[in-house]
């Protein structure tokens, strides 16, 4: 815990930027969910008390899945594959976009307790923001009409948005920020990609050949698993927040 506070104190400005992004994501999710619920004449509260209990359980599962990260052969070691978006996506489909963002946020907090940041919070920021780009569009599309077809459409759109956003965010902000915080030249980071794939010679090359396939793979697998299990879990989740 002391190492966590030390990391926070050493990167106060970055942590504040991270918190601002979290607030923005919550506001976007809340405004959209309230608007859709009003359109559908749905009077259920956005965050009922019983929902929060399930959200807590899903957040803990997501944090454990985030720690269990796997290396991928086509990307440097600071990129990894995890399935922490799975509980968030399932929770978002069941309870709405706000629940999905809350699971993503609580996941990061729990993960930092289980395993302190090794990237000065850059990795956690990347995971939260990029994951929300999958969870938010998918759950919003599903919220308009809750059907299997709509869920598939939502996860496909979410995966594409996550991939596009993740690519731009890495190139424009995350990789330069990682370089700045750790004092590692961008050329050295690009070199890590070149060591794996000789065709990588620039930030854009690193993003196109590492970040894009990683996000497509992650989004595709998480979406597929969600579609396969959600129908069976849905009655249980709905019953849980009505009890």
Name the predicted role of every residue range:
Residues 1-243:
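Loop-helix junctions at membrane interfaces
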């Amino acid at each position: 815990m002391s190492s966590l506070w030390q990391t926070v104190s050493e990167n106060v400005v970055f942590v504040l930027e991270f918190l601002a992004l979290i607030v923005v994501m919550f506001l976007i999710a809340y405004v959209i969910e309230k608007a859709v619920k009003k359109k559908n004449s749905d009077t259920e509260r956005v965050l009922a008390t019983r929902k929060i209990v399930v959200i807590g359980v899903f957040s803990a599962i997501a944090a454990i899945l985030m720690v269990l990260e796997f290396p991928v052969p086509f990307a440097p070691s600071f990129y990894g594959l995890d399935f922490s978006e799975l509980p968030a996506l399932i929770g978002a489909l069941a309870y709405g976009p706000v629940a999905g963002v809350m699971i993503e946020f609580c996941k990061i907090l729990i993960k930092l307790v289980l395993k302190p940041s090794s990237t000065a919070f850059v990795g956690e920021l990347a995971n939260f923001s990029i994951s929300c780009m999958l969870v938010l569009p998918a759950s919003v599309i599903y919220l308009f009409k809750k059907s299997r077809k709509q869920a598939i459409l939502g996860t496909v759109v979410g995966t594409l948005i996550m991939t596009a956003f993740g690519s731009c965010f890495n190139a424009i902000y995350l990789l330069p920020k990682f370089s700045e915080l750790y004092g590692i030249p961008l050329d050295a980071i690009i070199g890590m990609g070149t060591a794996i794939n000789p065709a990588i010679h620039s930030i854009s090359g690193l993003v196109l050949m590492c970040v894009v396939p990683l996000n497509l793979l992650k989004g595709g697998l998480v979406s597929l698993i969600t579609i396969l299990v959600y129908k069976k879990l849905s009655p249980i989740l709905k019953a849980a927040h009505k009890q």
